[in-house]
Amino acid sequence: MSGHSYASVVDRIYSRKSSELYDNIAYLHHPSGVTVVVLRNIPESEVVEVDFGTTKKHGADRSTNQVSGKGKKGALILQPDSKLCTFKCKDGSEHVVRAGVRGTLVEMNDRLKTTPDFIRTAPDNQGFIAIITYGAGVRETEGMGDDLPPKRLFLKS
């Protein structure tokens, strides 16, 4: 029997990049300039809670932020050290996820409120953390590191 190796669906569409500042996150970068923030180092223990925190200025939950229109009106501006969320594991450990890049926060994954373990069990799709854009005409930004190897699927024939 011979096997075949294929790039995952995510890796066929997005390029996987590391963060220059934080080793716990990775970016799935689309050629259109949209970037999905995902976990790079998956915790061993079950994730039991995700806290999207509050902004200092408005005191609002980031996951309830409403963005509208082509200009992304209402989106939050992120700095590399902006905290996106904190998640807690069953073993008592707590992990902070920061943006790592300068950009505009378009969406937080509010599904993580009801099913927080998606961060661990499906990090590249249902368990993504945030979606970031960079403004008109900007396709890449500082803070993204080297390309990471794509995930491969192995099928037996």
Curated annotation (Swiss-Prot):
Q: Any idea what this protein is called?
A: Uncharacterized protein F54F2.7
Q: Which molecular function terms from Gene Ontology are attached? A: actin filament binding; actin monomer binding
- Quote the InterPro entries the UniProt record gives: Abitram (IPR039169), Single_hybrid_motif (IPR011053)
Instruction: Identify the GO cellular component terms for this protein.
Output: dendrite; filopodium tip; lamellipodium; nucleus
Taxonomy, top ranks, is: Eukaryota, Metazoa, Ecdysozoa, Nematoda, Chromadorea
The GO biological-process annotations, alphabetized, read as:
dendrite morphogenesis; regulation of actin filament polymerization; regulation of filopodium assembly
Give the superkingdom in one word. Eukaryota
Q: Which organism is it from?
A: Caenorhabditis elegans
